[in-house]
Amino acid sequence: MKRFISIIVFAVLSVFVASAQNDTIKVLAIGNSFSEDAVEEHLSGLLRAEGLTVIIGNMYIGGCSIERHVKNLRGDIADYRYRKIDPQGTMQEINGYTLEKALADEDWDYVSVQQSSPLSGQPESYVLLPELVGFVRARIPEDAVMMFHQTWAYSEDSSHKAYVNYDRDQMKMYNAIVETVAA
């Protein structure tokens, strides 16, 4: 498992390093607590450790699903906490932000979207993903890269109430997520 994680981290860093041409890399996550952990903390730190200049944006709503993101974009609902980390690593948080406003804030190089963890292994919960991606794609530079942030399975001893969706079985949840995302 550690080898697999190392390969993934190397692959992700390689993509960002290859695209950095003595320029600032701008990454926007449209997500939830998983994007807070993975993008704000881990990716930001890894890129800075490589000596890269990076701006991280995170449109954050705890537990936010694709369905809720689409509801927010359709209604231009200012329901997000926009957390932005500047090139010096300083974070600013603004409450009451819309997707439209965040997408216009920078010429983003990378934009990730994700599903909420309870729904991440349920294929029927992704029916609105094309609408979310289309909305984002129409508002970012043509050469920007859209990414899907795959969530991870809960820990074996998780007390998360949605863990019952996977019979409280970490491998069952992991396999459901992988199969759903690959479809």
Segments from the language model and where they lie:
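Positively charged n-region of N-terminal signal peptides that target proteins for export
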Residues: 1-4
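Bacterial N-terminal signal peptides
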Residues: 6-15
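Residues in and immediately flanking transmembrane alpha helices
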Residues: 15-16, 45
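Boundary at the C-terminal end of the N-terminal hydrophobic targeting segment
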Residues: 18-22
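Conserved SGNH/GDSL esterase-like catalytic core that processes O-acyl groups on lipids
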Residues: 26-28, 37-129, 142
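A short, structure-level motif marking secondary-structure boundaries and short turns
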Residues: 27-29, 166-167
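Alpha-helical cap/lid subdomain in secreted, periplasmic
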Residues: 96-183
